[in-house]
Amino acid sequence: MTKYVFVTGGVVSSLGKGIAAASLAAILESRGLKVTLLKLDPYINVDPGTMSPFQHGEVFVTEDGAETDLDLGHYERFISTKMRKANNFTTGQIYESVIRKERRGDYLGKTVQVIPHITNEIQAFIERGAASATCGEPDVAIVEIGGTVGDIESLPFLEAARQMSLRLGRNSACFVHLTLVPYIATAGELKTKPTQHSVQKLREIGISPHVLLCRADRRIPDDESKKISLFSNVPEDAVISVWDVDSIYKIPQMLHDQGLDRIICEELKLSPKDADLSMWSELVEKLENPKHEVTIGMVGKYVDLTESYKSLIEALRHASLHTSTKVNIEYIDSEEIETNGVDSLKHLDAVLVPGGFGRRGTEGKIAAIRYAREAKVPYLGICLGMQLAVIEFARDVVGLKQANSTEFDPDTPERVVALITEWYDREGKVETRTEDSDLGGTMRLGSQRCPIKPGTLAEEIYGKDVNERHRHRYEVNNRFVPQLESGGLIISARTPSEDLPEMMELPRSMHPWFVGVQFHPEFTSTPRDGHPLFKSFVEAALANKEARAGVQA
């Protein structure tokens, strides 16, 4: 029988509930337990797919094609269990499901209310999500409840968690509450009052936390922990300090050293083997002792909010671990390139253009791609970054001066990138879309396997085939591929069913390392294994740096 750990947050948002939940899951998995995680989001949107990156940050795509919260990316990076659509749900999905049932008459004429109908539906979604775990029936399901205690939006989720813990009985569920202990510089001390009030608010709802994770910019002294324990009615050893560190991969060891996994296992009456966190220790050791260093420029329009590129940033960090190379990422606003030119790129060892939507900033990205191609600087284009690389090549090499995407110019006569109208999903089902389709849930989503052209750089990196996740509406137009290939561009991977271009590259006679991919490889990178594409990219950046240093010498 699956047991549940509910993770809640108090005082303020963005304290790191997702990292804390993922770190706990990693420790429990290291003890031989099968673990899954769920994220409950209180917003009314059905999913984050149509939300602005400035509002929500990255949208993480699961293997089965769900657009989910970025915390699911942390979950997959910290444990071996893969996430699915059922691992993330929102208030919007809950209400949509309940209203559909009411319209069908499932409630037999009853008045449909938040309690019990909404709370029952939340519990059903939680249990369904746990049951769908890719690891089989999990021993523990960790349920992260988004938002902050006291928010109106979170109340139904907290009430559902309270009811569920009561229904399951003792030793079947426990609560971990993450809260802020701020340091007041003028007073020169940490303040515990916000934590006391947060726990009090939680207890008013009927939930008494078993563990407190106290976030601060420093380790919390024993005296303060005792005070928190006294006023919060939580045992002193269950008041756990979570201080700022320079790498999230240090968190599992930090929590284990303070006994979090022991407390959870005792509360849930679990008797697993001892934790083995040697993998995490080795990762941290590699992270802190690199042998090389490179600087990669990430050219985009969301560079002021790095949460928009969370998985991509982590994938580069994973590559740094597996190449013993410190990767410095410089975020470059593509609109500034449009105004000031490409001088800001000339010191870089490699250039990366990530995915994105909309016309704004695209000409700056194209200018960056042109610079990388002409200066022989390693280039990686992801999703939109591949499409723009094709547009730049079509304009500047093939001579199609009006080459563009119909996303940016619907009337362009040279539509080298255009809307996909029909494709197969990962299960072989035909999906269709038109210009008038809803934005939400109408992209090509999820993982798909496709063969790689022999003798290409793509084959060196991936082998015979590639299986990656997608999130896009537009695709390189096959009508222009013969002209692109006549100019030297190589389509190195295509979908087996629709023959859609998945990867492009330039031959080594034209460029040492120039690759574009229509998919999102960052979603499958983990600290354990890294990712072959990002490892190859970092190695190319290092080779470019060493070659330039040799020329200058």
From Swiss-Prot:
Regulation: Allosterically activated by GTP, when glutamine is the substrate; GTP has no effect on the reaction when ammonia is the substrate. The allosteric effector GTP functions by stabilizing the protein conformation that binds the tetrahedral intermediate(s) formed during glutamine hydrolysis. Inhibited by the product CTP, via allosteric rather than competitive inhibition.
GO molecular function: ATP binding; CTP synthase activity; glutaminase activity; identical protein binding; metal ion binding
Binding site for ATP: S14, L15, G16, K17, G18, I19, D71
Positions with a binding annotation for CTP: S13, D151, I152, E153, K191, T192, K193, P194, T195, Q196, K227
Pathway assigned in UniProt: Pyrimidine metabolism; CTP biosynthesis via de novo pathway; CTP from UDP: step 2/2
Matches recorded under InterPro entries: Class_I_gatase-like (IPR029062), CTP_synthase (IPR004468), CTP_synthase_N (IPR017456), GATASE (IPR017926), GATase1_CTP_Synthase (IPR033828), P-loop_NTPase (IPR027417)
UniProt-annotated binding residues for UTP: S13, K191, T192, K193, P194, T195, Q196, K227
Metal-binding listed as a keyword: yes
Catalytic activity: UTP + L-glutamine + ATP + H2O = CTP + L-glutamate + ADP + phosphate + 2 H(+); L-glutamine + H2O = L-glutamate + NH4(+); UTP + NH4(+) + ATP = CTP + ADP + phosphate + 2 H(+)
Family recorded in the similarity comment: Belongs to the CTP synthase family.
Name of this chain's protein: CTP synthase
